[in-house]
Amino acid sequence: MKLSLASIGRLLAQLGLTCQKPLFRAYQQNPTLVEAWLQTEYPKIRAQAKRVGAEIFFEDESGVRSDFHSGTTWAPKGQTPIVRVTGARFSLNMISAISPRGTLRFMVVRGGVGAQVFITFLKRLLAGMDHPIFLIVDGHPAHRAKSVQRFMESLEGRLKIFFLPPYSPELNPDELVWNDVKNRGVARAIVNGPRDLLRAVVGRLRYLQKTPNMVQSFFHAPETRYAAAM
């Protein structure tokens, strides 16, 4: 028996299936570790933070290139719009940390993000804080560097770092900061040079800093609501 694609589509619809854009998960992810994080590890971190008066932040790094494009624009029917952009290639790296209360701290760097850059960001994150910080990060090598460990020990309890389960970026609300910056900041800007890219990135990050309710919304996605403020 042979079926056309249209017939197959109708049969799938009758079974209650729809065509959807899938979510991608690394096959290396360990579901047991993810479940333990959601049900045991993070609740312990939250309880400990409450006991010592610490504020929880989620941190992440990302990069953006001059050739990043997304979104749509208007044009007469049948005429594909053309946006003139530079053919040059340049990029920026970004670091940010967000809290369930809606606080956002960030740093933009040219070049790689190694241990010393991460330490510089940690110093900025701690600046002006009168309470300890519990920082949740992924397994990036910079986060596990010995120099970072020594720096943390020198702070005498002002900073404590916890690690997300491996290959689990969807558990980090800070990932949604980058989605916002790239799609609502960079994608809507005309980028003709490095300064334009920097202006678009910093402008969007500063906007998010001034709108804590938007930052809080990153903790209400299906995969991140476990970390929302209580």
List each model region and its residues.
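Short functional hotspots at interaction and active-site rims
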Residues: 1-230
